[in-house]
Amino acid sequence: MATGPVVHPQPVRGDPIDLKNAAAKNRRALGDIGNVDSLIGVEGGKLNRPITRNFRAQLLENAQVAAAANKKAPILDGVTKKQEVVRAVQKKARGDKREPSKPIEVIVISPDTNEVAKAKENKKKVTYSSVLDARSKAASKTLDIDYVDKENDLAAVEYVEDMYIFYKEVVNESKPQMYMHTQPEIDEKMRSILIDWLVEVHVKFDLSPETLYLTVNIIDRFLSLKTVPRRELQLVGVSALLIASKYEEIWPPQVNDLVYVTDNSYNSRQILVMEKTILGNLEWYLTVPTQYVFLVRFIKASGSDQKLENLVHFLAELGLMHHDSLMFCPSMLAASAVYTARCCLNKTPTWTDTLKFHTGYSESQLMDCSKLLAFIHSKAGESKLRGVLKKYSKLGRGAVALISPAKSLMSSAP
């Protein structure tokens, strides 16, 4: 059955009209649903006249004139709030001649700007400890060796003193003990041969100095914990070099390259197994203050030139080859290398207040270790182990291996 729109019957003229329903239909539009016109409610309460188009335009024009006088944003029709219109009309009616308020300057600060500002503010702050350090240095005539790096954020000048205090406190925790009496198949000569060979490999691969010192530290710590047969000593050395290279270098040598330098005495699997064995025995503890960490600081405190710096490294690497150097901690070995080098070059004074302050050692405390280094230096030319001597005989390193040993330390050398 088709459906269509329903047509309601229209009232016939003369029929009675339902006044009750008609009253409901004749309510004022928008009078009770909250959509109140924004221009109703000006001064004097309710308007006593209907809002015509002309009257509404007049009110809006008055409000815009008042806003322009106050240097405010122009009022758009239907957007301005009721209170703003009321204030504008009232102000115009009473002729308020107060000066308009000045616009507020808004400064937008990004999070990065906040961090930079805080960093600069913290950098300008002077701590009480830094004041005490500065006074103590001035009293003892020590030089501020970090002055040139104060503007270099990477130098971490504000932390460097605390870092080296910490290094000196923990240096003995990673210091290897003298262990030759616990190794039935290895002696001091074999260890010296191994270190000399590692120096040549280190030069061949052009590795950083940190890698060499960490390699020797790993070897000595491992041999002080575990007995190693003679046939595996070179395997321990090359595996320690691999570990140190992975820790210090951006591009460590490949395992196959290390197999090659051993003349295929070991295969890659043996090197990787020994690497895992060493790390397990050391409990993966590789972040240690080696002798090189202190050498960098003490050379800076010495105010040395390139010749003195090369000579210090030469003496330190000669000391690495000798088992007797394990009697001394890395910080003392580094300080003694600086002292011995200054004696070789006849620097005056031999030991300054600045060196004493930064190393923590007096001249008398370094005497035994310095005499040992001077003795090793004097015997280097007679030794068959030429790795370190060849390295520092080149002009690129100042040929410092040709410098004579310190005579002042040789008179009572061991």
Curated annotation (Swiss-Prot):
One GO term (biological process): mitotic cell cycle phase transition
Expressed in which tissues: Expressed in roots, stems and flowers.
Matches recorded under PANTHER family: CYCLINS
Entry keyword Zinc: no
Keyword annotations of the record: Cell cycle, Cell division, Cyclin
GO molecular function ontology, one term from the record: cyclin-dependent protein serine/threonine kinase regulator activity
Name this polypeptide is given: Cyclin-B1-3
Family: Belongs to the cyclin family. Cyclin AB subfamily.
